[in-house]
From Swiss-Prot:
It comes from the Eukaryota. Residues 167-176 have a biased composition (Basic and acidic residues). This is Protein mitoshell. Required for male meiotic cytokinesis through its involvement in the regulation of mitochondrial aggregation and fusion, astral spindle assembly and contractile ring formation. Residues 167-193, 389-414, 485-512 are annotated as: Disordered. It comes from Drosophila melanogaster. Keywords: Cell cycle, Cell division, Differentiation, Meiosis, Spermatogenesis. Residues 177-191 have a biased composition (Low complexity). Residues 393-414, 485-503 have a biased composition (Polar residues). Disruption phenotype: Mutants are viable and females are fully fertile. Males show premature mitochondrial aggregation and fusion in spermatocytes and spermatids, leading to an aberrant mitochondrial shell around premeiotic nuclei. Improper mitochondrial localization occurs in the testis associated with defective central astral spindles and a lack of contractile rings which leads to meiotic cytokinesis failure. GO terms for biological process: cell differentiation; cell division; meiotic cell cycle; spermatogenesis.
Length: 649
């Protein structure tokens, strides 16, 4: 038996940790991912051999092909006696992982693409079906590596590991070779969002919870950008194009920091506020896109210089934002249409069954317009609008008249169709679009809402007919006209029992005075000048409006809110000439001081005491300067019912 026997010293050998890496590039939906690796892990084990043991080598070991069987040749090569030839266990497992899992496992288990390309290793080729038999040796296992669960792939959009079955199901999905450009943009958006769109289709909007971290990140970045923009706007404030930009940045910062006011506005204004908000957001988003696309899509040399100064990756970020904007704009348009349909249902329940067919036809026309907008071109949309089949203006009175005429078989003329009706036609649309702080809104049958505040209650028609009694006035006038011939009888008949018409007459002195007289003009001028001086006062912000007073001093407001009027109301009365004399305006200014002093006699509030001293000092300084005389108004203390005029006429 020609088997060579070699004597080797006692050694402790450990199997080599053989790793084979190769890079695989695959297409994850629409993204090119180059971070997938397949590793061959060989189980680590160590064994100890007895001293002066013989190593039997049946022949030279020839490494076979990675994809073929091992074959031995008849030629026996000479083996160097200084080297011990061995073959470790061919146990191997295949792993595929994304960049996230590689970084989690560490550099000992995973290698990046660049490192594997630059570092050279020895990569022996093995095949598990070789016929070599391990010599029978006495060994003991010292350490074994616990193999982890094999992971096949990872979705880079959601960082969720996918099993083999999910990969097969994804591979079986039909992928159209040619799609419409609009659909391709949406598909790329869905692929970039990972499994978010598939989950969203199964859940309602109220059941989807977004990450709070994104909210904090956007707020942090926006605040930082607002500060930088405000500094730049202040630096360039003398340029005409920077007019009011600093105010816009400051208001944006306030909007980011103050609490969300959507729920209070919905509670006070109703669903119309939500419709207005979505229309407002739609216009702002599209306006932002209009500004940016002027810089992106134009290619003159001057704009190219500007685009080169933009940060690297701006064009790619704009393109991805443009794709997502296309989707969100469509969603917003459908959102305020759906909200308007909900508003129409509430109006139908408010107005009764008569207005239901009209509102239903308007909502159907809106829905058909959106569907035609998704499927047809611009020519069809303009054709539908010019022929009268386009969208209606959200159930305006003009559309109700038009629908009633169509139901009766009467076709309105073109002049009647396109003739503007001013505020009558656009009242409801303006109610949704304009801000509630800028427009006075009243309740009517169209479903408009009241702005938050205090208003006179609406009176029914029957009450309005009963309040002005016309017959007693006529009888009173006729009887006085008949008794003019007897002047001696006028004195005993003066206190007539029917004196109710006298109480209904207005008690305002302005109705009995001539506003164009010299006295009336002088009083009006003094009140206007006094209101301007009050506006220039300092330390009156906390009493400028009762809402501010309630925020700063809630206990004082709770006890004394009905005992004084705020500074804003005093200024408005001066501008409207509601005061008969300037003394009344001064009395109301000092009425605030008197009310606070009375409150501080019973309660303790150091902040209120300090601020009322500042307020009183400002008022006294104003009243002691020209055109007023010193100590001219010291007799006016602000007490209820005090005598304002210290002289007799």
């Amino acid at each position: 038996m020609n088997i060579p026997i070699y004597q080797v010293p006692s050694v402790t050998m450990q199997s080599l940790h053989q790793q084979s890496l190769y890079q695989q590039t695959y297409l994850d939906r629409n993204r090119m991912v180059t971070d997938v690796f397949v590793q061959e892990h060989v189980s680590q084990s160590s064994w100890s051999m007895a001293g002066s043991s013989a190593v039997f080598i049946p022949g030279p070991i020839i490494t076979g092909s990675a994809h073929g069987h091992c074959h031995h040749t008849a030629t026996v090569s000479t083996v160097s006696p200084q080297l011990a030839t061995f073959m470790p266990f061919p146990g191997m497992q295949y792993y595929a992982a994304s960049s996230a899992t590689m970084n989690a496992y560490g550099h000992n288990q995973m290698y990046s693409t660049r490192a594997s390309a630059s570092v050279g290793f020895y990569l022996p080729q093995y095949h598990a079906s070789c016929s070599h038999e391990q010599p029978k040796k006495t060994f003991c296992a010292a350490q074994t590596q616990t193999q982890q669960t094999a992971k096949t792939s990872c979705d880079v959009g959601t960082q969720v590991d996918l099993d083999a079955e999910e990969l097969r199901s994804e591979a079986r999905k039909p992928r159209p070779e040619s799609v419409v450009p609009e659909e391709s943009s949406i598909s790329s958006l869905e692929s970039g969002a990972g499994d978010g769109f598939r989950v969203q289709k199964k859940l309602r909007n109220s059941e989807v919870k977004l990450l709070d971290q994104r909210l904090h990140d956007i707020t942090r970045v926006s605040l930082h950008g607002s500060e930088i923009a405000e500094r730049l706007a202040n630096a360039h404030r003398n340029r005409p194009c920077f007019k009011k930009i600093d105010t816009l940045c400051a208001r944006l910062k306030q909007d980011l920091l103050r609490p969300d006011g959507v729920l209070p506005n919905i509670n006070s204004q109703g669903i119309a506020w939500a419709v207005k908000d979505f229309i407002f957001v739609f216009t702002r988003i599209v306006n932002a896109w209009v500004i940016l696309k002027g810089y992106v899509y134009n290619t003159p040399d001057a704009l190219n210089k500007i685009k080169d100064e933009l940060p690297s990756g701006f064009m790619a970020s704009f393109d991805s934002w443009q794709i997502s904007t296309l989707s969100i704009v469509k969603m917003i348009v459908k959102s305020f249409v759906n909200l308007d349909e909900l508003l129409q249902k509430q109006k139908n329940s408010f107005s009764g069954k008569d207005g239901a067919p009209i509102n239903q036809s308007n909502s159907i026309s809106l829905r058909s317009f959106i569907d035609s907008n998704d499927s047809s071109g611009l020519a069809q949309k303009y054709l539908g609008m010019t022929t009268g089949h386009g969208p209606s203006a959200f159930s305006t009175p003009n559309n109700q008249i038009r629908n009633n005429a169509a139901s009766k078989g009467q076709e309105p003329t073109s002049s009647a169709l396109y003739k503007p009706k001013c505020a009558l036609n656009l009242n409801y649309l303006y109610t949704m679009i304009e801000d509630s702080e800028e427009t006075q809104r009243h309740v009517d049958a169209n479903g408009t809402y009241l702005k938050t505040g205090t208003y006179q209650p609406l009176q029914k028609e029957s009450m309005q007919l009963e309040m002005p009694p016309a017959k007693p006035n006529d009888h009173y006038v006729e009887r006085n006209a008949n008794q003019q011939a007897l002047p001696s009888q006028e004195i005993p008949n003066a206190p007539t029992p029917k004196s109710s018409p006298q109480s209904d007459r207005p008690r305002d002195v302005r109705s009995y005075t001539n506003p164009f007289s010299a006295i009336g003009k002088e009083v009006t001028r003094q009140l206007y000048e006094f209101s301007d001086r009050v506006m220039e006062l300092k330390n009156l912000e906390r009493f400028f409006k009762k809402q501010f007073t309630r925020n700063y001093y809630p206990n004082f407001y709770q006890h004394c809110q009905d005992d004084f009027i705020d500074v804003r109301a005093i200024i408005l009365r001066c501008e409207n000439s509601s005061y008969h004399h300037i003394y009344q305006a001064i009395h109301d200014l000092r009425r605030i001081i008197f009310t606070v002093r009375c409150y501080l006699q019973m309660y303790t509030d150091e902040n209120l005491l300090y601020y009322i001293d500042l307020y009183e000092r400002s008022v006294n300084d104003m009243l002691s300067k020209p055109p007023h005389y010193p100590n001219q108004f010291d007799h006016i203390m602000g007490r209820p019912g005090e005598k304002l005029f210290n002289y007799e006429i």
